[in-house]
């Protein structure tokens, strides 16, 4: 699903100059591919989740369509921005989380936690989507870039 996500996002960014992607220390070598083609609209904050979401909020408030990408549980490192701005102020940031169910269960203790998606869903005002097919994923991405609300998109490994 991640490959399909990045392939389709690449296509969407080629058609819409208002779409940005913020990588949060994840996504190589796709980051390099995006940076080469969309240098001013591709950002990598490395392990700075709070910074990534703060940048996403600012870009979104200036009219840009912003995707962020990291491993799902890492979004909790930016909980303050998610709660105070993205959720409370309904800033339309599209948070994409890699890993669902047991995708990262063999990696380490902090990259996998079955409660993370459910906890993120509990934040008021952030609808969450769990596409299972490439058709569902592409359709949901097309819908999300047209919406003016925040969202979370879960991507299987």
Language model segments and positions:
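Thiamine diphosphate
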Residues: 1-157
């Amino acid at each position: 699903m991640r490959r399909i996500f990045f392939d389709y996002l690449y296509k969407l960014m080629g058609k819409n100059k208002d779409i940005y992607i913020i990588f949060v220390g994840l996504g190589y070598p796709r980051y390099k591919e995006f940076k080469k083609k969309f240098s001013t609209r591709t950002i990598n904050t490395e392990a700075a989740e709070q910074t990534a979401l703060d940048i996403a909020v600012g870009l979104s408030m200036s009219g840009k369509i912003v995707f962020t990408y990291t491993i799902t549980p890492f979004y909790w490192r930016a909980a303050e921005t998610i709660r105070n701005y993205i959720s409370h102020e309904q800033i339309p940031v599209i948070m994409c989380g890699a890993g669902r169910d047991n995708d990262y269960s063999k990696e380490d203790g902090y990259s996998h936690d079955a409660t993370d998606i459910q906890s993120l869903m509990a934040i008021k005002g952030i609808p969450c989507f769990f596409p299972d097919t490439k058709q569902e994923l592409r359709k949901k991405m097309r819908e999300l870039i047209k919406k003016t609300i925040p969202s979370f998109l879960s991507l299987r490994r």
